[in-house]
């Protein structure tokens, strides 16, 4: 059964959706209630044009683990394909996505000093093979576990913004995102990304998070060769390999020194830019504690 599961995933990613579903069906009795299995089968159902099946699988995965971000991400896509108004309830691209400046970074020299520190950490020659970025580098390890005073100050400023963001959330125990509100948060991951040339992020979500982010620090200048919305954060556009052909729900233009916060279950990526200029960001995932 385990071999069937792995083969099903591989066949699905190769575009052999029907063959993958046959293998998923055969393995299903041994993977009852298994979140990764349910998510992988829901993904394949979307690719096969079976949004009702994807909905049922995603709901089963979410019932098993309410914090399963893939379950919410695939459920959102299933509801969108079905024209179900609950998609807008689950992912509210106006209320749940916020862009606010970090006041400290507006102080003279603060942004430049932070960028200098971060550039010193970007030692890799290319992007990590298991991450969403293409044409750039990502720092190693947890960025906010480093002891540099500039990074410590950034961490404190970010935590204050996250706390304010959570305070603005409605009290809704029935909503998969809002019901996780808590007295505090823990940063489950933190990193910096430096993109150059035609660098970009493919559409993805963050399974280990609750609130995800993009803090833009260096924004490339406009280039006549740029595509529309070059360098922007794109939210709600599903992965191209699913073949759904759905446009973004929201596009956020980057502003140097401003932090964007959004649910970790929202599909997100970036639009490539044409010039050889730098795009420098910090990102993190926050999870509730207490």
Predicted feature residues:
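Short coil turns that delineate tetratricopeptide repeat
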Residues: 1, 31-33, 65-67
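Non-heme Fe(II)/2-oxoglutarate
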Residues: 88-180, 200
């Amino acid at each position: 059964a385990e071999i069937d599961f792995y083969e099903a995933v591989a066949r699905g990613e190769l575009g052999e959706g029907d063959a993958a579903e046959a293998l998923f069906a055969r393995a299903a009795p041994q993977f009852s209630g298994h979140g990764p299995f349910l998510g992988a089968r829901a993904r394949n159902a979307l690719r096969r044009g079976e949004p009702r099946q994807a909905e049922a699988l995603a709901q089963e995965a979410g019932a098993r683990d309410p914090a399963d971000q893939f379950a919410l991400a695939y459920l959102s896509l299933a509801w969108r394909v079905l024209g179900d108004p609950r998609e807008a309830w689950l992912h509210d691209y106006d209320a749940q996505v916020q862009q606010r400046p970090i006041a400290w970074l507006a102080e003279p020299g603060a942004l430049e000093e932070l960028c200098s520190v971060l550039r010193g950490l970007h030692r890799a020659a290319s992007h990590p093979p298991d991450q969403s970025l293409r044409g750039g580098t990502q720092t190693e390890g947890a960025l906010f576990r480093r002891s540099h005073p500039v990074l410590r100050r950034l961490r404190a400023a970010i935590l204050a913004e996250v706390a304010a963001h959570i305070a603005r959330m409605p009290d809704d125990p029935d909503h998969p995102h809002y019901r996780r509100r808590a007295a505090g948060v823990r940063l489950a991951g933190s990193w910096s990304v430096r993109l150059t040339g035609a660098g970009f992020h493919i559409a993805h979500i963050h399974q280990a998070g609750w609130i995800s982010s993009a803090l833009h620090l260096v924004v490339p200048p406009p280039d006549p060769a740029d595509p529309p919305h070059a360098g922007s954060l794109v939210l709600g556009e599903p992965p191209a390999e699913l073949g759904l052909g759905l446009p973004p729900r929201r596009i956020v233009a980057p502003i140097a020194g401003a932090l964007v916060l959004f649910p970790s279950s929202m599909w997100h990526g970036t639009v490539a830019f044409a010039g050889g200029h730098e795009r420098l960001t910090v990102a993190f995932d926050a999870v509730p504690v207490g």
